[in-house]
Design a protein with these regions (language model features):
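PLP-dependent aminotransferase class I/II
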Residues: 1-105
Length: 105
């Protein structure tokens, strides 16, 4: 499928680019899986690095965004029971979605 092949090509270019960038890890396929790379994302060192990355990229015309807003941080759910969400918070404070367009020739 051309669509998925194009998405995977974009991801491969990101993987190559970010492999030599310190403190930034590009999300890649897990072993024995084949991702369609619907969204591309990077993991940064901490919340401060995430904010810096978002500011720098968006200020320079590259549209990036945090991976998600946690539901327990939304006013209507802030009093709902949860287990502390340690792992979820770790990712929310570090992951940034980067442009994931399709380029079909």
């Amino acid at each position: 499928d051309k669509y998925v092949a194009s998405k995977r090509k974009v991801a491969a270019e990101y993987e190559e680019y970010f492999k030599n960038v310190p403190d930034i890890e590009f999300f890649v396929d897990s072993p024995n899986t084949v991702s369609n790379y619907w969204l591309n994302a990077v993991i940064l060192q901490d919340k401060e690095a995430q904010i810096d990355f978002l500011t720098q990229t968006n200020d320079n015309g590259v549209m990036t965004r945090p991976i998600w807003e946690l539901m327990n941080r939304l006013p209507m759910f802030e009093n709902c029971e949860n287990d502390g969400l340690k792992n979820t918070i770790w990712f929310a404070d570090r992951v940034v979605n980067i442009p994931s367009s399709v380029r079909i020739n």
